[in-house]
Amino acid sequence: MTDPNQSLAKSFEPAAIEQKWSAAWEAMGISRATLEAGRPDFCIQLPPPNVTGTLHMGHAFNQTIMDGLARHARMQGANTLWVPGTDHAGIATQIVVERQLDAQGISRHDLGRPAFVDKVWEWKEQSGSTITRQIRRMGASIDWEREYFTMDPKMSRAVSDVFVRLYEQGLIYRGKRLVNWDPVLGTAVSDLEVVSEEEDGALWHIRYPLAQPDAKTGLTHLTVATTRPETMLGDVAVMVHPEDERYAHLIGQAVRLPLSGEADALDTAQWREIPIIGDEYVDRAFGTGVVKVTPGHDFNDYAVGQRHGLPQISVLTLEAKIADTAPATYRGIDRFEARKRIVVDLETLGLLAEVKKHTLMVPRGDRTGVIIEPMLTDQWFVAMSKPAPEGTRFPGRSIAEVALDAVQGGKIKLVPEQWVNTYNQWLNNIQDWCISRQLWWGHQIPAWYDEAGNVYVARTEEEARAQAAAKGHTGAIKRDDDVLDTWFSAALVPFSSLGWPADTPELKHFLPSTVLVTGYDIIFFWVARMVMMTLHFTGEVPFQTVYVHGLVRDSEGKKMSKSEGNTLDPVDLIDGIALEPLLVKRTTGLRRPKDAPNVEKRTRKEFPDGIPAFGADALRFTFASLATLGRNINFDSSRCEGYRNFCNKLWNATRFVLMNTEGQDCGLQECVGDCGPEGALHFSPADRWIVSLLQRVETEVEKGFADYRFDNIASAIYKFVWDEYCDWYLELAKVQIQTGTPAQQRATRRTLLRVLETVLRLAHPIIPFITEELWQKVAPMAGRAKGDGTESLAQQEYPRAVLAKIDEQAEQWVQQLKALVDACRNLRGEMSLSPAQRVPLYAHGDAEFLQAAAPYVQALGKLSEVKVYTDAAAMEQDGAGAPVAIVGENKLLLKIEIDVAAEHARLSKEIDRLRGEIVKCEGKLGNESFVARAPAAVVEQEQKRLADFKATLGKLEAQIARLPVQTA
């Protein structure tokens, strides 16, 4: 623990401080949730990361915001629960373990399901604590005693219970639907696990012969444009727009499907006929205006098929090879090899009209990179739009409808509000949710089958056997091989993590939770589903507010991806990393290994010396400053350096305060009412000013928390500490301590301590480590802590503005003082005086103010003296030839001996040079050819040079105008 009497170290070294306070906070139990009556409740759920994953920048950003909210609530006296958990992450975790086995020459099928699942559990135990250790490194004040894993027995029981109840309510069913199919993983995947990017492809124009030539036009065929010739084997129709004058008269007729001969694809006699249909889905301007319809392999075609009652033909196997339902000519061939053969055969038959280059969006599995195939398979679904039966909490209303009403009725608030439209649009167009996955790792679906295919859905195998026996079946039953979508268990977290289905005190206190902090990319996949499931099973909304933040991207706005080599590891930003290991990290696991040289080149340019250690506080402050309401967060690590400098500034300011208050009379026992020149405490305008500004900052910070504007919080704290407290008040305080009366000195020391102690409490939710370390030193001195090391800053009261302490008169006084000091500094700069060169300043104007301000101006302006005149003429005479500054009603003369003629000549020469540079710049920028052809950065640089030249010219012209008039 901190010894408050031990002097503060000379420099801020974050590593040791972070390690010390992480351990101390856990030992003190500062994050342990309380359930006290009469106190407000605050709850926040950690979006459960992959149990075997590692912390990425999105996690670190998200957790900075959540920790700021949790610490703020805790300091405001709320029963605060931050629920931690990790997700089993079915696909991601299974892939990792399968790759480990592949390296040993073993497949999961060699092991069998039970042994493979055991291997996954082993991997979970080995690596499962990595991410929680990394979360701790960020300073997250989480109640780790309540940590769950989505496949813990309690969580698994809740999952089974929900599945069974939904099935019994008729809201879960099994059916054949089109899903995203990853042929490498051999499972359905969610939309979130599909990445669609533009790729170069082709548009094949294929002639489909009309079953009967068109008597009206003599047309013998329709030309169909497609990007996927291989799926034409499963075509069941061609369609045109019903208002397309070229083809509308053909609706109801038929074409013969090329290459559809069952035994011989090229035998035209075997080709089957398919209808020509009309549908407004067709874009008349795309391709030829005629589109093939393949409901078994295209989501849009599936919807068309449903509207028109068309059959569904699957011509691909689950391994993405041509199936036995297709012509024998192509069976067993890989889909892309089949594409090549089909194109050749069409060309042979004279049915390939043309091939055009075409850019299209190609869906790929984010884990495998393989092209995703829409596939008709038997899957389990949750009915999203079906009315719930009697006996449920919302009978007659669908799950989606109830979730829509929760936001529209104001029970859930989305911040910013723009995301309400996104939420509503998705729920208004929702499809039934495919919840089954063809994996071995995950919650196995609680359904069993007998030999006749009858299904028994139950919480346990014993229950399933009892159901089977009740129906007269006494033979063996087999459990469904599939597991549930990871998002299914994640959707239950708001209530399952609090002990549901048991009726627990935690559910009473913390459901609904106060706020959910999440990226906009999972509004559909997680947020909406939590709303649906929580309302359906508890009648409560899962959370009162959803704070939707942007996604962390690199400094150029590109998505961070390990496969692209542009990721940053938050722990590397905290601890630092040398260049060589950083290069290894960034060039390993690239999606395109050939990109490694470019990634290395970019990394060497961006981080020539590796990444320095910034510490967790600097990283957190950077994240907070970037937390705007925009869609993207472009992360530039150079900003961390600025916030590391802020931490150093705060550290050094604290050292100054302690050195000037330790062992001194700080007036803490004096009554503040006993103030004034004759009292025990005499607060100056500067003292009252900094306290007044502090109230304004406290108000701004509180509004920032209320509005979830962490960027405003960070900005307010930064500006107050750096610009006002450090740059101005500490300098003014030095003067007061050196020249003031005992009452003024006591008041100054008291103000230094009390303002600093308040600032440390104010900034603690954003930068917890450094503020805790400094508070342990400052608080006892400020009379705010016992000083025995048993108290934590995290448990103190959060500052609240006292509006009565706002002193506009003092603010105005210091504003005038700042203007005087700035004017004096400008005069020194214009006259090129060195800091060591001390000269007198003559002043005339508001004599009372100038007299009071003189000690400050002398010290901060590095002057030998400040002489205040009541007679303007006398000042002009004494300061003849001195440079002048006018500040409001006050006139300042910097008494300096100069060679007027030489200075005039020097300034004139520089002015002439600048005018010449301006002419050159204006000539360049006035040249249309230069502006049009030069890179934007070059033009921008030239514009900046012109602006700088003009600004400098203005200063020099003002400076030469102030020189005394030369007489012959």
UniProtKB/Swiss-Prot annotation:
Keyword Protein biosynthesis annotated: yes
Q: Which Pfam families does the annotation name?
A: Anticodon_1, tRNA-synt_1, Val_tRNA-synt_C
Quote the catalytic activity from the record.
tRNA(Val) + L-valine + ATP = L-valyl-tRNA(Val) + AMP + diphosphate
State the EC number(s): 6.1.1.9
- Coiled-coil stretches: 800-831, 898-963
Where does the motif 'KMSKS' region lie? 559-563
- Choose one Gene Ontology CC annotation of this protein and give it: cytosol
The subunit field of the Swiss-Prot or TrEMBL record says: Monomer.
Instruction: Share the domain note from the entry.
Output: ValRS has two distinct active sites: one for aminoacylation and one for editing. The misactivated threonine is translocated from the active site to the editing site.
Identify this protein by name: Valine--tRNA ligase
What lineage does UniProt assign to this protein's organism? Bacteria, Pseudomonadati, Pseudomonadota, Betaproteobacteria, Burkholderiales
Gene behind the chain: valS
